[in-house]
Amino acid sequence: MEGPAFSKPLKDKINPWGPLIVLGILIRAGVSVQHDSPHQVFNVTWRVTNLMTGQTANATSLLGTMTDAFPKLYFDLCDLIGDDWDETGLGCRTPGGRKRARTFDFYVCPGHTVPTGCGGPREGYCGKWGCETTGQAYWKPSSSWDLISLKRRNTPQNQGPCYDSSAVSSDIKGATPGGRCNPLVLEFTDAGKKASWDGPKVWGLRLYRSTGTDPVTRFSLTRQVLNIGPRVPIGPNPVITDQLPPSRPVQIMLPRPPQPPPPGAASIVPETAPPSQQPGTGDRLLNLVDGAYQALNLTSPDKTQECWLCLVAGPPYYEGVAVLGTYSNHTSAPANCSVASQHKLTLSEVTGQGLCVGAVPKTHQALCNTTQKTSDGSYYLAAPAGTIWACNTGLTPCLSTTVLDLTTDYCVLVELWPKVTYHSPGYVYGQFERKTKYKREPVSLTLALLLGGLTMGGIAAGVGTGTTALVATKQFEQLQAAIHTDLGALEKSVSALEKSLTSLSEVVLQNRRGLDLLFLKEGGLCAALKEECCFYADHTGVVRDSMAKLRERLNQRQKLFESGQGWFEGLFNRSPWFTTLISTIMGPLIILLLILLFGPCILNRLVQFVKDRISVVQALVLTQQYHQLKSIDPEEVESRE
């Protein structure tokens, strides 16, 4: 600043109503985050750049959420000054210059929103007193709304650290790489952690000198967020591309014993395996059914003697079982909290009672057996193996306590099971034969009802010898891998639907699961039962050609039914035309037979009835011609005489 223009500031002259600073840049990979889970973990990089030289003063990367990834940033004042600072001759080119920089106070002014009178880049946005919001000076510049604070750390008193250890002899005590003897620390305030980082932000920094012009430098702070997810192309529908038929089962070849190389032969470097490709529609859904079968066969072999496992065509495609478990605390995000394991899908069906975290509303407290209160601090709660946190914002393997403290988010620890229904063979065959009628629809058994609670302690039943939990088996790992693959495909379809800029027909085509199951049904891989796509399974595994298996079983049942019939019933079954002929002439024949049997008797009775009526009529006619004589009593005649 120009000394004659105005006097040096006093502590009570600082204007507390300075401009609001918004700092940082959020670099996203082309995907909107408005629907992402607040617990989603990203690779966040904060970068402090000297705008005068273009050099990076600090680049700090960490795994964290958008709510708690605000670390302390450490760098040196000379990283912001450079070798030469303005035309004053100050700078950090020499140890003396670096030592002299320790004697000056400094103050910082925001450059993103510059109030009237604070100047521009040339003035470092500090054109007048009251524009500064932080720094290290005797009047202690600060603000209650600023997003950062920039202060000195413990500054060494001796001159040794100001010498560059790579450019001087080893007899200089305390020499440091680059001669760093002006350490600074940048911290985010509460306002900064709640702010919206929507672009690169710049500050001006000036050294406070009692006389003359205060030298100026500028620096920026940016935030980069990497691995947020795959880019979604704008163009033709991306859903149909991976609807590939299932691959043939690979025959397992027994490994051959290694043969010793011939003498004098050069060693052969084995070829690396090609990178694995994402499974197509057929393989992905068959892997899901096969994983469900493997887990069911391991825990309940009696249920897999012969059964049908069906995928539902309509949502929900997954259901959760609330469980009690012991989560682990981590001060930093563990590896399993990566973006690949985050899902913004909502779990609409949760049963049971389990462990809850956060502010659970009354409408969902029935799912909570225990509600855990989080302690103060910023750390991560990692779900135990085989489970996941089902939150009102999506599915996540890890929770950020910072998010829970700042929001009304709540989560339940659940086991995640695909919506695979279990049907007995009799029910399926009866539906296709249409011979069995039910007064009410039988209750559908799902994988969650059959296996729910088997991965956690207490309810965790032993498998095999009774000492191995289901979560530790290869069968369960196979099911979990299939679940994550299918969830990724569903989420990709949802994202494509959200970003679709094409016609309505393409939007309708992106009913992903319905398309997938239709694809399998048309290929004969599954049997369509109402709203389900069913696969046949027995102790040999899941049959891929389920329609052929269904036809085979129906033919066997038909032959067994025919073998139990008599020759007369078999005659009708073997001659369809005879059945039609008999049903056509049977009515008239029965009527004719009844006439022949009962006709004469009825006719005789009718004739006799007619004769009786005629005789009565004749008698009446004859009596009309005569008069009845009065009868005389003989005794009365004698008495008269």
Curated annotation (Swiss-Prot):
Location of the motif CXXC: 307-310
Motif CX6CC mapped to chain: 526-534
Q: Which domain of life is it from?
A: Eukaryota
Q: Which Cys-Cys disulphide bridges does the record give?
A: C109-C126, C118-C131, C307-C310, C307-C534, C337-C391, C356-C368, C398-C411, C526-C533
Annotated stretches, region: Immunosuppression: 509-525
Q: Using the record for this protein, list the coiled-coil segments as residue ranges, or answer none.
A: 471-520, 530-566
Keywords, alphabetical: Cell membrane, Cleavage on pair of basic residues, Coiled coil, Disulfide bond, Glycoprotein, Lipoprotein, Membrane, Metal-binding, Palmitate, Signal, Transmembrane, Transmembrane helix, Viral envelope protein, Virion, Zinc
Which chain positions carry the site (Cleavage)? R440, E441
InterPro entries membership: FMuLV_rcpt-bd (IPR008981), TLV/ENV_coat_polyprotein (IPR018154)
Summarize the PTM comment.
Answer: Specific enzymatic cleavages in vivo yield mature proteins. Envelope glycoproteins are synthesized as an inactive precursor that is N-glycosylated and processed likely by host cell furin or by a furin-like protease in the Golgi to yield the mature SU and TM proteins. The cleavage site between SU and TM requires the minimal sequence [KR]-X-[KR]-R. The R-peptide is released from the C-terminus of the cytoplasmic tail of the TM protein upon particle formation as a result of proteolytic cleavage by the viral protease. Cleavage of this peptide is required for TM to become fusogenic. The CXXC motif is highly conserved across a broad range of retroviral envelope proteins. It is thought to participate in the formation of a labile disulfide bond possibly with the CX6CC motif present in the transmembrane protein. Isomerization of the intersubunit disulfide bond to an SU intrachain disulfide bond is thought to occur upon receptor recognition in order to allow membrane fusion.
Report the GO molecular function annotations. metal ion binding
Q: Name one GO cellular component term.
A: plasma membrane
Q: Which residues does the annotated region (Disordered) include?
A: 256-281
Motif YXXL motif: where in chain: 626-629
Task: List the ranges whose topology is Cytoplasmic.
Answer: 603-641
Residues glycosylated per entry: N43, N58, N297, N336, N369
Signal peptide positions are 1-32
Q: Where is the lipid attached (S-palmitoyl cysteine)?
A: C601
What residue ranges lie in the Extracellular compartment?
33-581
What sections of the protein cross the membrane?
Answer: 582-602
Q: What is known of its domains?
A: The YXXL motif is involved in determining the exact site of viral release at the surface of infected mononuclear cells and promotes endocytosis.
Q: What does this protein do?
A: The surface protein (SU) attaches the virus to the host cell by binding to its receptor. This interaction triggers the refolding of the transmembrane protein (TM) and is thought to activate its fusogenic potential by unmasking its fusion peptide. Fusion occurs at the host cell plasma membrane.
Q: How does it assemble?
A: The mature envelope protein (Env) consists of a trimer of SU-TM heterodimers attached by a labile interchain disulfide bond.
- Name recorded for this polypeptide: MLV-related proviral Env polyprotein
Organism whose genome encodes this protein: Mus musculus
Could you read off the lineage of the organism from its UniProt record? Answer: Eukaryota, Metazoa, Chordata, Craniata, Vertebrata
